[in-house]
């Protein structure tokens, strides 16, 4: 059940520069997400969907504008504080799974907790982290695959592992950037159903970037970006937290090739 405003952004601008060429991507974006909400961000290629997610998730900084999380401004934090925020409050899922090939699925899930711990802390609490990782692997339906290497897993199983890894730190806010973009249609539906369950049962707030309107229509609300602007304005009204079906969401392309292709994991 969606609640009070959890994160909001005001007048966000982002420009990518390469040599003498400047490419404005976001041009004054305002948006909000409520606590417990499952929000979709859709738009055409180059509209700024992934850029917006990177800014909200403190993976990048805006050129102008402000971002607030739990009523505290976060876009102007130091690099160390942003790292801490990503590793303790946020979880990230991307189109590509970014699993370390030499580690088992279970070991991949444990990585964020290893990174946030000191050596001595890990020696004392590693078994607790392992138990939580096992619980999450079972939660995403991979209890029987946790000791397999990534190369032994299907695409859907690798994405489920990535979701478990994103949840290991018990994040309050989960960012999902095209989580079904590398999967077949049926597997993609399964992944989105898993995200819905996490939202509804565990009350995880989710911001999802997707080009798939069928998927987007199954979330609480939809924001459409057009040429760096929000075309469908956001209104945080209690009655708006059902499925939204805007009439203007037509003829979107199949994929987005964003100027910034970097896919960094929080704290990794």
Tell what function each PLM region has:
Residues 229-260:
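Conserved beta-strand-loop-alpha-helix hinge in the C-terminal portion
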Residues 258-268:
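Non-catalytic connector elements of ABC transporters
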Residues 1-5:
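Extreme N-terminus of proteins, especially the signal/transit-peptide cleavage junction
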Residues 6-225:
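ABC family nucleotide-binding domain
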């Amino acid at each position: 059940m969606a609640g009070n405003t959890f994160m909001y952004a005001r007048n966000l601008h982002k420009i990518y520069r390469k040599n003498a060429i400047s490419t404005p991507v976001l041009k004054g974006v305002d948006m909000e997400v409520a606590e417990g909400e499952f929000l979709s961000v859709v738009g055409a290629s180059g509209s700024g969907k992934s850029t917006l997610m990177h800014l909200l998730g403190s993976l990048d900084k805006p050129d102008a504008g402000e971002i607030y999380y739990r009523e505290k401004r976060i876009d102007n934090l130091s690099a160390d504080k942003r790292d801490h925020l990503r590793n303790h409050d946020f979880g990230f899922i991307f189109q590509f799974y970014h699993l370390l090939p030499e580690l088992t699925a279970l070991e991949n899930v444990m990585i964020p907790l290893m990174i946030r711990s000191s050596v001595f802390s890990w020696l004392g609490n590693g078994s607790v982290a392992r138990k939580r990782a096992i619980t999450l692997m079972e939660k995403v339906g991979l209890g029987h695959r946790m000791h397999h290497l990534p190369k032994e897993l299907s695409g859907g199983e690798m994405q489920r592992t990535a979701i478990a890894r994103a949840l290991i730190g018990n994040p309050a806010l989960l960012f999902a950037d095209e989580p079904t973009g590398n999967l077949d249609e049926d597997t993609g539906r399964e992944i989105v159903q898993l995200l819905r369950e996490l939202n509804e049962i565990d009350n995880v707030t989710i911001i999802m970037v997707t080009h798939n309107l069928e998927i987007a229509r199954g979330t609480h609300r939809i924001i459409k970006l057009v040429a760096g602007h929000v075309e469908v304005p956001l209104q945080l009204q209690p009655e708006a937290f059902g499925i939204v079906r805007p009439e203007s969401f037509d003829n979107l392309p199949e994929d987005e090739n964003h100027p910034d292709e970097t896919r960094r994991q929080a704290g990794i």
